[in-house]
Amino acid sequence: MRLVILDDYALASEWAAKYICNRIIQFSPGPDKYFTLGLPTGSTPLGCYKKLIEYHKSGDLSFKYVKTFNMDEYVGLPRDHPESYHSYMWNNFFKHIDIDPSNAHILDGNASDLQAECEDFERKIKEAGGIELFVGGIGPDGHIAFNEPGSSLVSRTRLKTLAMDTILANAKYFDGDLSKVPTMALTVGVGTVMDAREVMILITGAHKAFALYKAIEEGVNHMWTVSAFQQHPRTIFVCDEDATLELRVKTVKYFKGLMHVHNRLVDPLHSMKKN
């Protein structure tokens, strides 16, 4: 497990974007070899997406041979609703890059058969060769995707009822009106993410500090689903200084002492530009 600690949100976002960029380029994707990337929504990854868009526009990075799989989608929210995750991904990322829309996979929360939709999503991931790198964020209660506290740590893509804490947290996106917030969602399972060859979790802000503490300093616990990734062979937690406030001083000191190693993963930043 790696814990990468940056000074602030902007630097954490940039480090994560550089890492994704380098992983894609080093993979050497092509028409017969697509890079598969799991993606989150929410406020945390926005800075990372902006940097990836910059790398694309500068010619350093192409998503032509990348397939993406998003973590989740609300049930019953129209696809073109401004708060649907289809809209989020299109407006904040996909419309700014060269990904083929047919390669951007997002669960359909309006499918006539939601169980079949979940099973089909798992099948598509398998047919794509599995996820090479799954990027995620967490809630203050340590949930990843919509795997709320108490979720099975071997769960697969499924229909989930959202916890009241999640509904309250999401109300800000629906004019503060709880009656407008969806109460159910389709989500990848913890087991789905664990199957990825590598997982990178973005955690920023003091309000996520206790969740980071639970994620790495205490044992695996289904009440803090992010803690499952202690058992993944290749997990990277990327955080800012504020998110470390609940960690032991010696933990922070230990991982900061490894930053020269971590920075070799992103420096130099690779490029797809032709020399």
Swiss-Prot record:
Subcellular location(s) per record: Cytoplasm
Write out the entry's keywords from A to Z: Carbohydrate metabolism, Coiled coil, Cytoplasm, Hydrolase
InterPro entries, per the entry: Glc/Gal-6P_isomerase, Glucosamine6P_isomerase, Glucosamine6P_isomerase_CS, NagB/RpiA_transferase-like
Task: Tell me the domain of life.
Answer: Eukaryota
Kindly report the protein's main subcellular placement as a broad class. cytoplasm
Q: Under which main EC class is this enzyme filed?
A: hydrolase
- Entry-linked SUPFAM superfamilies: NagB/RpiA/CoA transferase-like
Q: Which intervals of the chain form a coiled coil?
A: 103-131
Q: What are the recorded Gene Ontology BP terms?
A: carbohydrate metabolic process; N-acetylglucosamine metabolic process
List the catalytic activities from the record: alpha-D-glucosamine 6-phosphate + H2O = beta-D-fructose 6-phosphate + NH4(+)
Name the family the entry cites.
Belongs to the glucosamine/galactosamine-6-phosphate isomerase family.
Q: Which PANTHER family match?
A: GLUCOSAMINE-6-PHOSPHATE ISOMERASE, GLUCOSAMINE-6-PHOSPHATE ISOMERASE 2
General function of this protein: Catalyzes the reversible conversion of alpha-D-glucosamine 6-phosphate (GlcN-6P) into beta-D-fructose 6-phosphate (Fru-6P) and ammonium ion, a regulatory reaction step in de novo uridine diphosphate-N-acetyl-alpha-D-glucosamine (UDP-GlcNAc) biosynthesis via hexosamine pathway.
Q: What protein does this entry describe?
A: Glucosamine-6-phosphate deaminase 2
List the source organism: Xenopus tropicalis
